[in-house]
């Protein structure tokens, strides 16, 4: 199974434990892109709505495309009652949007699953002149606030983390947008924090793509090791989060 499809196997766990984003990030994004009633927005791969509520509640014409069938159904059950909510179950790479164009296209930890050339050329074509492309992600630091626990967790990874296929972190070039016609590229950062118990940390760790598919006999030993490490540290692990927002704009007069 492709890594980008494995999240669909854990919709409830994904919904509960994947990180949300800071209110400040959304305030800036909504203001920068001018999102509100009368504006059309497309979210790429919303998952179960980790970045959906603040945009949907602006009253914009909200659209989403979700690859996973179970994630799609979860989104429909959560937001189907909103009159401005529309979602399709499909693959952005191949989906035909027809003549529809958007004032903003945004992604919360999704666009990196799309080949760069397709990601930027297709979003560029789908945006109206002056439209905004927004890409957000979370970087969690659990080393700084839990140094001893961090070292213990690294021992667990060294002993038992044996995925059948490695996930290549950081391969997507967000600043590559400027190579495909986008202008005014910028990066903004916002601070946040999460605190997990041992059970919560194990459940959260189980939402990472390469952790979802971790095979036995390593899988049980790995997650048991994570659980015990946090229990021995007082049943508490802290993540100092950085929410990253990349913004780019389609020129009013595209070349």
Where are the model-predicted features located?
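Conserved Class I S-adenosyl-L-methionine
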Residues: 48, 165-166, 170-255
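Conserved class I S-adenosyl-L-methionine
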Residues: 1-36
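A short, conserved alpha-helix within the catalytic core of class I
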Residues: 113-123
């Amino acid at each position: 199974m492709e890594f980008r499809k494995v999240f669909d196997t854990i919709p409830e766990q994904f919904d509960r434990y994947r990180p949300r984003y800071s209110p400040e990030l959304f305030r800036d994004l909504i203001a920068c892109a001018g999102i509100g009633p009368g504006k059309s927005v497309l979210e790429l791969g919303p998952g179960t709505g980790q970045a959906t509520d603040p945009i949907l509640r602006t009253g914009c014409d909200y659209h989403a495309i979700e690859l996973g069938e179970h994630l799609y159904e979860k989104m429909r059950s959560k937001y189907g009652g909103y009159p401005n909510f529309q979602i399709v179950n499909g693959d952005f790479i191949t989906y035909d949007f027809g003549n529809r164009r958007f004032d903003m296209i945004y992604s919360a930890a999704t666009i990196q699953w799309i080949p760069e050339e397709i990601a930027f050329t297709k979003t560029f074509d789908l945006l109206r002149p002056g439209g905004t492309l927004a890409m957000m992600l979370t970087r969690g630091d659990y080393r700084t606030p839990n140094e001893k626990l961090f070292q213990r967790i690294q021992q667990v990874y060294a002993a038992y983390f044996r995925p059948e296929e490695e996930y290549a972190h950081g391969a997507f070039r967000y600043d590559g947008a400027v190579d495909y016609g986008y202008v005014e590229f910028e990066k903004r950062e916002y601070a946040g924090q999460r605190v997990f118990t041992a059970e919560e940390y194990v459940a959260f760790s189980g939402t990472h793509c390469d952790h979802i598919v971790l095979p036995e006999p390593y899988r049980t030993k790995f997650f048991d090791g994570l659980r015990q490490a946090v229990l021995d540290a007082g049943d508490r692990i802290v993540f100092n989060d950085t929410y990253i927002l990349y913004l780019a704009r389609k020129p009013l007069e595209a070349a």
